Amino acid sequence: MSKGLPETRTDAAMSELVPEPRPKPAVPMKPIGINPNLLGYIGIDTIIEQMRKKTMKTGFDFNIMVVGQSGLGKSTLVNTLFKSQVSRKASSWNREEKIPKTVEIKAIGHVIEEGGVKMKLTVIDTPGFGDQINNENCWEPIEKYINEQYEKFLKEEVNIARKKRIPDTRVHCCLYFISPTGHSLRPLDLEFMKHLSKVVNIIPVIAKADTMTLEEKSEFKQRVRKELEVNGIEFYPQKEFDEDLEDKTENDKIRESMPFAVVGSDKEYQVNGKRVLGRKTPWGIIEVENLNHCEFALLRDFVIRTHLQDLKEVTHNIHYETYRAKRLNDNGGLPPGEGLLGTVLPPVPATPCPTAE
């Protein structure tokens, strides 16, 4: 080796002397809530507009069931709720000849459009409920119908050739009409709500509230709430499904006001220079949307304006999922039928349920 020149080393020797580089520490993630303007606009807020456009284009399903004895104004109230003739009143009949011998299920579909949004509404009526001398187990055909709609949706969901949007016939809401006796709930009322509250969103309402004084109405509402609590019956909105403190605060106010004491009417009258929906009595006009007269406006706002989407989500994520899990556990597999997947079911999405084509 020549003098004055540094000694050279081979690559192998160098690798022994130079240590392996240490891995770089992970770069900490930016904290949530950072100002997006510092990094540039992402566009995640457009999801709201995307959902709006899709809803405007396809519309959405809403299926409401009405249950109660005849003569409680079920059809009138539903027509008042949606300001349309969406439920047909039963024609006058000879009671001995025309009253159904068993509970019937009648579904009537309508499309209601408002502000460019289409709602595919189905009203499910239950003539014959509670009208017999012996009403034992008269809730069973109603529970059977509700479960049949879950089964229909389940079979579509696991089908290989499933549709992009599965037609949704599941019952999202059941209005249960309580007779305005002013005393207590009947055994039939308790039996129905005890069984059906496990499979559908039940909203109890006191029918024909104009037949009671304000004091009678207040006392009856408190008595009904107490009886439901004592019998372990939870109506919608269920406490266990409150998602946060804001939900709980809002829903507690609603639960304290239930059951809503309502009056329905499709007739208009002139009151103080304004046309209002109401019922004419010897004492004056009962205004349907006047909270001093009845609680129809509270029911309408609750079902349509604030909780409609939640009714659909609880149906899909709670009631349907409960049926789905039980159905598969009981049978040890998928429901029978052609073209069904032989593998594990896809997970239920935590999103609003699909709408009909």
From Swiss-Prot:
The modification Phosphoserine is found at S91. Residues 207-210 are annotated as: G4 motif. It comes from the Eukaryota. Residues 58-330 form the Septin-type G domain. Pfam families: Septin. One of its GO terms (molecular function) is GTPase activity. One of its GO terms (biological process) is cytoskeleton-dependent cytokinesis. It is found in: Cytoplasm; Cytoplasm, Cytoskeleton; Synapse. Gene3D superfamilies: P-loop containing nucleotide triphosphate hydrolases. GTP binds at residues 68-75, 102, 208-216, 264, 279. Keywords: Cell cycle, Cell division, Cytoplasm, Cytoskeleton, GTP-binding, Nucleotide-binding, Phosphoprotein, Synapse. The keyword Cell division applies. Residues 1-29 are annotated as: Disordered. GO terms for cellular component: cell division site; microtubule cytoskeleton; presynapse; septin complex; septin ring. Septins polymerize into heterooligomeric protein complexes that form filaments, and can associate with cellular membranes, actin filaments and microtubules. GTPase activity is required for filament formation. Filament-forming cytoskeletal GTPase. May play a role in cytokinesis (Potential). This is Neuronal-specific septin-3. It comes from Bos taurus (Bovine). The gene is SEPTIN3.
